[in-house]
From Swiss-Prot:
Belongs to the ubiquitin-conjugating enzyme family. It comes from the Eukaryota. Accepts the ubiquitin from the E1 complex and catalyzes its covalent attachment to other proteins. This is Probable ubiquitin-conjugating enzyme E2 26. The gene is UBC26. Residues 532-543 have a biased composition (Basic residues). The keyword Mitochondrion does not apply. Pathway: Protein modification; protein ubiquitination. GO terms for molecular function: ATP binding; ubiquitin conjugating enzyme activity. It catalyses: S-ubiquitinyl-[E1 ubiquitin-activating enzyme]-L-cysteine + [E2 ubiquitin-conjugating enzyme]-L-cysteine = [E1 ubiquitin-activating enzyme]-L-cysteine + S-ubiquitinyl-[E2 ubiquitin-conjugating enzyme]-L-cysteine. It is an enzyme of class 2 (transferase). Residues 271-431 form the UBC core domain. Keywords: ATP-binding, Nucleotide-binding, Transferase, Ubl conjugation pathway. It comes from Arabidopsis thaliana (Mouse-ear cress).
Length: 543
């Protein structure tokens, strides 16, 4: 008999051994064997499975749930994604290392007890198509080889504390052609260690029954679409983003740019503490939707803010992080601000070293009313100024020497080229943020880019097809005058060149459908008209 096929004999009147089986009563449509004690596998005790062969020597193993499709590992370093090393040095094992391995499920009688009352005909074969790795060394008289199928692909990245974690798997045999084939739901447990925390079952994988099934036609499972799993994951991530507080406090900021400077809250004056707390209150009540802030309880002088790039700008859908420190003389002087640049200069006011140039900070020229006013200016005003004055639609004109050229043909042309380059740098910033998310924003970064991945890919496809930068709104091309223009040839080529890197990062986040079926290029009126003109010219020349 092949190792991946189990032949189920006709239901005996007398069970194997000397036991006498009592007549069966009517069984419900679904039998849940979780209520059994799994006497053929081990004894459940205190939510753990004790293996009889290992004499009860217990090793506690962390569990995880497949119902939760979100990735919970912390942000990794720039070049350490494959091993999923988090900020605290916890090395998590990639799911792919153990999910492709076969396992042997011993004690055929466990299945026999469940399937006997269902009158499965002799010669019918059941192929169980997916499962996890087993390290069990015990021998068995009969076994089933369970292999991982494509239906596993939709679960995204899962962080585990150990490789050898046994799981509960559901299999369903739905009624189709004959009334005697009721739905049977059972769970197979193969303990890797004496004590194991029981975990939640995934959604049952539907089997399709074939009445003509024989030794050469096993009953096979239809894989669950990864697109459906991704849709469920998207709902969870959208819910996470909705519930994510725009302002909150955290315990520490070990990776903060100003962590090594300043002092603890207890060493500041009462007036300083009172002013900072007033800023906290304003941020908590009045932060706009596109800005989120985290303040440090043990170091009240530290803040971290993230701003979402606005639609219609070369920064759309991106995340831009800023580390902020209140000086000892605050509010007599403005806060110190450092931009997480990743070595990229995406704006005349945002240097690749992290310096932020703004009149409100005293790092840029401006009128008296544009500078920091100790009795009036607030932290909220500073963040909104960065959002509106720096991360704007035409950052080229942020440079004082170029302001006078705004509205001229030459100035607008140069601004267009500059903005196209900024968008490419914004894509690189996305990759940088995904690979190295700032502390306390790890899940936020992952969920944000998971949810926005399709809009970003659609925008890239539109730009490749000739749509002008900034014309994409909610995944579609705006029907505006500027939408009848076209992006430069270099811009289209550069977007096409770097786009795959961005898509690869989205796939690592769990957006599997981008790898299976890339988004089709977006078309706009401009590109369609150009193709029609070319067709007309060809037809005229042929005459």
């Amino acid at each position: 008999m092949e190792p991946d096929v189990v032949e189920i004999p006709p239901p005996p009147l007398i069970a194997s051994g000397s036991r006498t089986r009592k007549p069966r009563k009517a069984v419900p449509e679904v039998i849940d064997v979780e209520s059994y004690e799994f006497r053929n596998v081990g004894v459940v005790k205190d939510n753990n499975v004790v293996d009889k062969k290992n004499k009860g020597k217990a090793i506690q193993v962390d569990s995880f749930s497949f119902n939760n499709v979100q990735s919970h590992h912390h942000g990794s370093s720039l070049l350490n994604l494959e091993t999923f090393q988090d900020y605290y040095g916890h090395k998590n094992i990639p799911f792919s290392e153990f999910a492709n391995q076969p396992i042997d499920v011993d004690d055929y009688s466990m299945y026999q007890d469940v399937l006997d009352p269902k009158d499965v005909p002799a010669g019918a074969e059941v192929t169980v198509p997916w499962g996890l790795n087993s390290s069990s060394k015990g021998t068995a008289k009969s076994s089933i080889s369970i292999m991982r199928s494509q239906s596993m692909k939709g679960y995204g990245t899962v962080s585990l504390a150990t490789t050898n974690v046994p799981q509960l798997w559901d299999y369903t045999l739905p009624q189709q052609n004959q009334a005697i084939y009721s739905s049977v739901s059972f769970s197979a447990v193969q303990p890797q260690t004496p004590d194991v925390v029981m975990v939640t079952n995934p959604t049952p994988n539907p089997f399709s029954y074939d009445a003509s099934a024989s030794s050469s036609h096993p009953i096979a499972a239809e894989p669950i679409s990864s697109v459906q799993d991704s849709s469920n994951a998207r709902k969870l991530k959208e819910e996470f983003l909705r519930d994510f507080k725009r302002f909150d406090t955290v315990e520490d900021f070990s990776d903060h740019h100003y962590a090594s400077k300043g002092k603890s809250s207890k060493q500041h004056s009462k007036n300083w503490v009172k002013k900072v707390q007033a800023d906290w209150k304003i941020l908590e009540n009045d932060l706009p939707e596109a800005i989120s802030v985290r303040a440090c309880e043990s170091r009240m002088d530290l803040l971290r803010a993230v701003i979402i790039g606005a639609e219609g700008t070369p920064y759309h859908d991106g995340l831009f992080f800023f580390d902020i420190q209140f000086p000892d003389t605050y509010p007599s002087v403005p806060p110190n601000v450092h931009y997480h640049s990743g070595g990229l200069r995406i704006n005349p006011n945002l240097y690749n070293c992290g310096k932020v140039c703004l009149s409100l900070l005293g790092t840029w020229a401006g009128s008296a009313r544009e500078k920091w006013l100790p009795n009036e200016s607030t932290m909220l005003q500073l963040l909104v100024s960065i959002q509106a004055l720096i991360l704007n639609e035409k950052p080229y004109f942020n440079e004082p020497g170029y302001v006078q050229s705004a509205g001229t043909a030459s100035g607008e042309s140069k601004s267009k080229v500059y903005s196209e380059n900024v968008f490419l740098l914004s894509l690189k910033t996305m990759v940088y943020s995904i690979r190295r998310p700032p502390q306390h924003f790890e899940e936020y970064v992952q969920n944000h880019y998971f949810v926005r991945s399709h809009d970003i890919v659609k925008a890239c496809n539109a730009y490749k097809a000739g749509a002008p930068l900034g014309s994409m709104v909610k995944g579609g091309v705006q029907d505006l005058e500027e939408a009848r223009q076209s992006g430069s040839k270099k811009f289209k080529t550069d977007v096409a060149s770097f786009m795959q890197t961005v898509v690869d990062e989205f796939v690592k986040l769990g957006v599997k459908e981008l790898a299976e079926k890339p988004e089709p290029p977006m078309s706009n009126a401009n590109t369609e008209n150009q193709s029609k003109k070319k067709t007309r010219k060809r037809s005229r020349s042929s005459r």
